[in-house]
Amino acid sequence: MSAEAAAIAAHAVVLQSDARALTECAERLHEIEARLEAGGLAPPWLREAVNAHLVACVAAAADLTTAAAHLRRYAERARS
């Protein structure tokens, strides 16, 4: 494997790791959102803020997963 292909593949691994971290963050935010909803005491703006961050984490995780897949394919082509 060329050094360039190895570097590209390494970036893909980092992006996928970041995507997993964001997915885990979204899961934690979902749990927080459920507890806030069940408690019924949190102001609507707090639930909305938590939900906005949850949605952002999900979107970012999807984007990073897509970027990692593109980098993996690019690394494969760079190896040839």
For every predicted segment, state its role:
Residues 1-80:
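N-terminal secretion-targeting helices of virulence/extracellular proteins
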